[in-house]
Amino acid sequence: MLNAPTQALLGRPLVGNGANGAPGTGANGGDGGILFGSGGAGGSGAAGMAGGNGGAAGLFGNGGAGGAGGSGTAGAAGAGGNGGAGGLLFGTAGAGGNGGLSLGLGVAGGAGGAGGSGGSDTAGHGGTGGAGGLLFGAGGAGGAGEDGTTPGGNGGAGGVAGLFGDGGNGGNAGVGTPAGNVGAGGTGGLLLGQDGMTGLT
């Protein structure tokens, strides 16, 4: 009874959790209720496609996690979806989805998604970058940790390269009290390649 008018007018319910995105579709998670409710998780991406973004919470609730990027074979791997924002008054933000892995011989890994904004609570952590191709291909960059009014989100780690290729750069730390941790750079190729750079504060 309470949700129907709000849903029709504003496109989201007054109370209730958002729906999760279906796996393999890259669909975004639904937003939670304006007053109470957590955002739904983003759906994982199909092969080579990005994961969906997590849904945002309202005043009270947790942000949905971003969906993982789809693995790449002939083409590039998909990026992870961004985490949803946490509740404005209370709630943890969603973490960014991990970048897709490269299953081919010369394909770069997908980048990790960024963490969701923290509202008044903990910010979301960045997703891990996907691993590069078995022979050639750089690791994906780690997602950035989001800013928060309390602890900032941690940056995601960069992806590891294969035999030839550079490791992905680590994600930057989110601003907060205290600040989040920076993401570590991914390891470069076993035969040739530089390690990724550590994220910045």
Per-segment meaning from a language model:
Residues 1-201:
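Long, compositionally biased tandem-repeat segments
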